[in-house]
Amino acid sequence: MTDSSSPDSPPASRNTFAHHLGMKGFLLMEGLLKLVGMKTLYRLGRAAGAVAWHLLPQRRNIVERNLRIVLDPALRGKELQKLSRENFKRTIANFLCSAKTATLTDEQLKHCVTVGGHEQFAAPVLEGRGQVCAIAHSGNWEALARIRAFYPEVERYGSMYRQFDNPLMEEYVYQRRTERGTQMFSKEGGIKAPMKMLKEGGALGVLSDQFVWEGVYVPFFGKVTGTTPLPALLRKRAGADMVAIAVRTDAPGHWIADMGNVVDFSRSDGSLAGDTIEVNRGLETLIRESVLDVFWMHHRWKSVDRFAPQDKKTAALLENMELKPYRILVAVPRALDEALATVPLIRALKTVRCDMQVNIVCPSAQLG
């Protein structure tokens, strides 16, 4: 167990008035959440999510695009709106309940969360091998920070996380989690310390389903996107096993943590990109169990103002895969000589990535 003076603890920082105000608000929110039962809080969160769906059209568009990619590109209209509204309801409810989960005792936690896949999760650690946990941002995600309550036989459990911008909140959350037996490793601190823990037979959680520009560009639900290679990298270097993990809603105020989905690397070519593809497949299997419990309010398949970096080995891996297209719309000039000048560019675009689909808009006279 670590403490606030350990090498992985948050660095000292000058606290501003805004930091103190934010901390006061955080503590006030926690105090209020303690007064509300979990089932009631979940229902209140759903009501707040329904309101947010109407008030946040930009976020709604993001959620609906993500759901079309995951479920069906043909989804439109009322059916899609119904799904996105339900996702908003669950997301806000899960957010509020996650905040309350941090305040629960271990016994209270066990009344709210059921763990599945106990043996698959614990087996490698009990045999002295590390266990990398590729985590999906879904359901009551705070339950995973408290997972040691369900695994007394697992002596060391750690989590990689992004530090809070507010140093007071950072110190508060860090100390609470470490006091409960979870070792915290900030992403800003590098991978040396978490790697050491894995090699010593610990279990390490890594959030693995967010867009990462500096990552490897491999398919997630059939569409290429920036993906963190960190879980695959840690597994390979530490000689560890891996499970994909997600939390899904079972009933109002109750969740199931699926802990036993062992990631199969037998189809991988052994490259970092190949291994990351298998990590994504493991996450996809769990997410399909409860798509609407996933946090979809972010650009998981973000379109950026430049083409994704790609190496030849990764490109070769993707060549034989069935991928959803990356679409580019090209508007051709009316003047014929100017239109002809765009042909080399259009041909070049087709070679940039194997999932490229170039759609051309041109005057009818230029067809043929």
Language-model segments: which ranges?
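Non-catalytic C-terminal accessory region of glycerolipid acyltransferases
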Residues: T2-D3, P7, R14-F17, L55, ...
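Membrane-anchoring hydrophobic helices of lipid-metabolizing enzymes
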Residues: T2-I135, N140, E170-Q175, A308-M321
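Catalytic machinery of carbohydrate-active enzymes
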Residues: F26, R59, E153, T249, ...
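Short, flexible loop segments at the rims of nucleotide/cofactor-binding pockets, characterized by
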Residues: E107-V113, R162, E179-F185, F220-G222, ...
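Catalytic core of membrane glycerolipid acyltransferases/transacylases, capturing the structured
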Residues: V125-E188, W213-V216, V352-C354, N359-C362, ...
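Active-site donor-nucleotide binding/catalytic segment of nucleotide-sugar enzymes
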Residues: G130-A134, H298, R327-A335
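Short hydrophobic segments within beta-strands
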Residues: A134-A136, M160, L207, I245, ...
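Short, highly selective alpha-helical patches that border small-molecule cofactor pockets
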Residues: L144-A145, P231, T342, I346
